[in-house]
Swiss-Prot record:
The gene is MT-CO2. Its EC number is 7.1.1.9. This is Cytochrome c oxidase subunit 2. Gene3D superfamilies: 1.10.287.90, Cupredoxins - blue copper proteins. It is a multi-pass membrane protein. GO terms for biological process: ATP synthesis coupled electron transport. It comes from Anisomys imitator (Uneven-toothed rat). Signal peptide: none annotated. Mg(2+) binds at residue 198. Component of the cytochrome c oxidase, the last enzyme in the mitochondrial electron transport chain which drives oxidative phosphorylation. The respiratory chain contains 3 multisubunit complexes succinate dehydrogenase (complex II, CII), ubiquinol-cytochrome c oxidoreductase (cytochrome b-c1 complex, complex III, CIII) and cytochrome c oxidase (complex IV, CIV), that cooperate to transfer electrons derived from NADH and succinate to molecular oxygen, creating an electrochemical gradient over the inner membrane that drives transmembrane transport and the ATP synthase.
Amino acid sequence: MAYPFQLGLQDATSPIMEELTSFHDHTLMIVFLISSLVLYIILLMLTTKLTHTSTMDAQEVETIWTILPAVILILIALPSLRILYMMDEINNPALTVKTMGHQWYWSYEYTDYEDLCFDSYMIPTNDLKPGELRLLEVDNRVVLPMELPIRMLISSEDVLHSWAVPSLGLKTDAIPGRLNQATVTSNRPGLFYGQCSEICGSNHSFMPIVLEMVPLKHFENWSASMI
């Protein structure tokens, strides 16, 4: 989860988020080098006494500043396309969970089980227990098995919402009349927090998401107790 005054991304918990973090660092380094080069050229132009006011044609320079940006864009595009394909790839999911956005709560249905569904509301500040997080705790957490591919089917009953869990690299729009899907895979157990990331009305800020990733045995015990 995010902390006050945090710099950088949240710790990666899924393979997709690890790839996104690496791509972020890769792109940031390219942007830093370009910015440094531009700043150096500007300082050079401001401090040098030499001028070339009569220069009308410089084909070598024009060739360089045409080819170089194209190469840089390719270096950014190739890893980006690879990650996009990885995010859309879903192979043999172990579990499917249907997520519906409402004003202003989430409802979940485990489609592989009969009658395993519930609504998830934010816990009001006055009802929080010591150690619980304001605006992030819910009355019903989404319990999922770790280290297994899980398919999330995401839609909405009313207006646009967005189901997002940053530490897992997830952000999928919930659109009325349309079913989007995403893959959830966690490398370790724990609680992972998210929020609705699409302005959806007056209580938009009060739609938290809490995923509880547990070992498979614990998940089986939980699902048996819920049915």
